[in-house]
Each structure stands twice: as structure tokens, then as C-alpha cells.
Amino acid sequence: MVVGDFATKRQLVIIGGGPGGYHAAIRAAQLGLEVTLIEKEKLGGVCLHKGCIPSKSLTQTAANFSGLSHYKQMGISIPEANFEYETFTNYYSSVVTGLQKGVEALIKVNKIEHLTGSASFMSGERIGIDSGHHFEMYEFEHALIATGSNSLLPKQAKLSNRVMTPHTLWELKELPASLVVYGEDYFALEAAMAYKQLGSDVTLIIPADGFSLDSGIEKELLRVLKKNKIKVFKNHQWESAEETADTVAVTLTKDAEEKVSIEASHVLFAAGYSPNVEGLGLEAINVERDENGFIAVNEHSQTSVSNIYAAGDCTIGMKLASKAIKQGKTAAEHMSGLPSAFNLSLVPYVVHTNPPIATVGLTEEQAKSEGYEVKTGQFSMSGNGFASILGQKEGLAKMVIDAKTDVILGIHMMGAGAVDMIQAGTYALEMVAREEDLAYPVYAHPALNEAWLEAIESVSGKAIHVPPARKKEKSTV
């Protein structure tokens, strides 16, 4: 290893080339900063290589495969279809490669210095970079930590080709005959439904009582899981896993007494993450962290050390690429002198199940616990004309509203188009929209978003496609 004799000066040094890191790098370069981006693996991070892109390739493939029966109903004759796992892995790998090349090209065209290696803080103004055969020192005005997180695994379990986490799932070479999924977040739900629809026998273990979604959505989700013949165990905690040549036996406990053993060919543990901060030298800068090691930041993405910022999964809060992107760009703008800030309460949460789930703002339960007097409106997708055309009538749309001010507090949907439509809900909450603001506009017809119109009108009992007996009150209009 060769050690450099001097420190290269940079206005911004970023550690981590995932969504938070590379978005921040490009935004900072756009604003005129000299930027060095350090990534020890491949640009794009977990999201591109082991998370968002592979997982959504999986869920989209499963949705397409399970939807083939509807084509026959529409008069389209299709020979018997088969799912080939190897072809699928080649497909998503090609998608990942294409997107990675795009990120690399963007970094280059924005004249961002990209270094491959491991970085660690020497002080509050210096970072050392070890490339394996060379060590360099950089002196920075600002630094951004965007190192992401890693999937946790219970102490009683060891990673193998049968015991997997969300980050190692993509090493699978064939479709599991049977799969136990342990977890309650979006990844657990997506994997459970996708593998079931592709042909695996799936059991979903939830360590809590639910999925932290609105009660209306949870009820519909459990119905859909049951319809798909996915076995669900609530309030069961992981105790151990014993692997044989062909199977894995998972032992679970409930109420610290009842024990259940479930056997499957494969197990996916998707319950918890730890921040990737080991070896970063955080002790040299003394940034504030929580009890699990996640970095605390303010609304500008600043840590407790004002010239050091952090973004994404290594920070406290949701583990979402959308959060990382917003935090990364906010950090770049703020250190450039702009008054940029973010509000994590308005980050949309999406689950690419079939049908998909999308939500933003407060659930009915959260709103009540925060002291709001709440009124709600709900509409089933079975009453939506375009959903019927698509053959995707499962799901519902729900509005949560402050009864005193008519301000919309939360928008929740499970159904076709939910992920694309939720952005309009984010706009509504950002602008502090009221009930009338969603009820007044003309909605295209036939369209999936008419479910939102029906849901908002059902708040006051004016929904057209809700039978009178189900309306909350009679209209006075």
C-alpha cells in the first residue's frame, strides 16, 4: 500500500454511491461544487443491485404471470405458460447492468470524481480512502455519509443457499419449492406474494400483530393473502432454524410459551437492518447516533456536526430509496447555501404486491392517537369500471380527514395503479388540501383514479357508486 504525502482538497466528499449518494453528487455538481464520490462496490448501491430493481423485477414478473388467465377471458389465446427462473435472473441482471451504466455515465458527464475504495474519517475535515493498493487523504469542506444498511440475521441462523436475507435472495438459482418469509415490511410482503404467484408454497410469519398499515388496507390485504393461499402467522417470534440437506425447520414462539415448527425448502428473514457504519471512523467526528447506530439528522440532512451530512438507510427512519434520494439532494442544496429541507412524514410508502399498496400521511389509527377528530371515506375497487376492464377488482381507496378543518391527513390505497397514483396524494398533503380540493376537479373516465373521487365523496355520503345503505349520511344537496 502506498500512502499519499498530502491531502487533496474537495468542497464535498460523499461516502456511498447508492441512491442517496449519487443523487447528492449530481445535484452538488449542478450547483457548482467540486465533488468526490467514494463507493467500495458498484455504483447504484443495494437499491440497484440487491433491492429495488431486482425485487420489482420479481414482483412485475409474478404479476404478469398470474394475470395470464385474464387474457383468455378477453379472447386472447395463450399456450400454456411456464416460468423459467434462470431466464428471469438473466432478465433482471440485464436491467441492472443497463441502469448501472447509466449511473456511471451521469457521474462522468457531471465531472464528478469517482473513487473505488473504503473511506474513513480521520477528523472533522479529513477522510482517508483505502483502495487496497493505495491510500489517499482528502480534505473536505463538507462530507455526506450515504453508506446504507445491511440486512440482519438472527444469531441462531447462518446464511446459506437456503437461509437468506433480502440482500442474498438474488443468489437463488431456482424457484423454491416452499418458502417461509419472516417479516412484516414491504419486502416481506412483496416476496411472499411474488413467489406464491410464481408457484412456491409460501408461509408468511409476522412478528407483530400487523403490517403497520391503515386498518382498512390491512383487512383487505389479509383477505387477498388468504385468497392467494398464503399461510399467515401473526405474533410469532423467531427462535431458531435448523437446516438439513433439503429443508430448513424454523421454530417460532408465541407469547413466550407456544412453539410452532414450520419446514420449508427455503427461508427468507426480512426483519431488521443495521447501519453500514463500521470502519467509517465515526468516533473521530462524534456524530450523534441512536441506540442501534443509525445517524441522527435534521430536516436539512445535517448531522450533529454541521459540515457533515447523512442520507438514506444509515440514518434514523424508514429504509426507503425515496427517502435517501430526497435527503441526498436536500443535503447538496443546503450545503450550497439553499434553504432546502424535507418532511419525512410525507414520504409515500409503497408495496409492490399484487394488487399494489400505496400510502402517504396518517392512518386512521395514527390520526386518532394524535388527537384528531377523524372522518373517513372508503371505496372498493370492485366498483371501479376500469379496474373491471383490467380484471383487477381487488383493493380499496381510503381517505382520512380532519373532521374539524376538512384537511386531508392521509390517503391509502390497495389496488391497480396505486403506486403511480399516490404521488397525487403527496401533492395534496404537501399543499394542505381539503376535502373539497379532491372532490371538485373533473376526473377522467373510465380511470382507476375515479376510486379516489368516490372515496372522498363517500366521506359526506355523496359517493355515486356506493349503495345508499352503506352511505354514512344522506346528502343535503
Where are the model-predicted features located?
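FAD-site-proximal beta/loop scaffold in flavoenzymes
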Residues: 160-175, 261-335
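Glycine-rich FAD pyrophosphate-binding loop
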Residues: 29-48, 200-211
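Short hydrophobic core segments
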Residues: 13-15, 119, 138-148, 182, ...
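A Rossmann-like FAD-binding core segment of flavoenzymes
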Residues: 79, 113-116, 120-133, 198-299, ...
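N-terminal Rossmann-like dinucleotide/flavin-binding domain of flavoprotein oxidoreductases
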Residues: 2-10, 49-50, 54-137, 214-239, ...
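Rossmann-like dinucleotide-binding cores of NAD(P)H-dependent redox enzymes
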Residues: 94-100, 104, 170-171, 176-180, ...
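Glycine-rich dinucleotide-binding loop and its adjacent helix/turn
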Residues: 52, 145-205, 231, 283-285, ...
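Flexible, glycine-rich terminal cap/loop adjacent to redox cofactors
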Residues: 8, 15-20, 27-41, 53, ...
